[in-house]
Amino acid sequence: MPIAVPDYKAPSWCPGGHLQTVIPAKFMPRPAIEYRREKVELPDGDFMLWDWAVPEPADPLAPVLVHFHGLEGSSRSHYAEALMAACTERGWRGVVAHFRSCGGEMNRLPRAYFAGDSDDCEWVLRTCLLY
């Protein structure tokens, strides 16, 4: 699978990937998302923090979209807020699952988050099937 579009041309006013990353993060309007935080206990005795964006009125049968933030990201990252706004506009329930110690609260166990660990991701997805 190709990782780039070979005929992509950056706009003349925004050449290069760095500007294309910074401009949306710093200068684009951000939706006002009201999250409901949930502290979810993990099977190993630790916890994760989940920030839910749920439309009102909430439909318990609406799809759940799970978002895993990027490195040093959170539910307040511009891309997470945009995605959660798109979810609620469609009537879906969205959740940003913060990796261990990434939600503003240090975890109980010495196990830390790292990008290569998919066990927590799998557990989150399986657990969200119950919601």
Task: Describe the role of every protein-language-model region.
Residues 72-74:
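Short strand->helix junction
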Residues 59-60, 131:
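Glycine-rich phosphate-binding loop signature in dinucleotide/nucleotide-binding domains
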Residues 61-70:
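Short beta-strand element of the alpha/beta-hydrolase
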Residues 86, 102-131:
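Catalytic nucleophile-loop/oxyanion-hole region of alpha/beta-hydrolase
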Residues 1-28:
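N-terminal presequences and immediately downstream first alpha-helices
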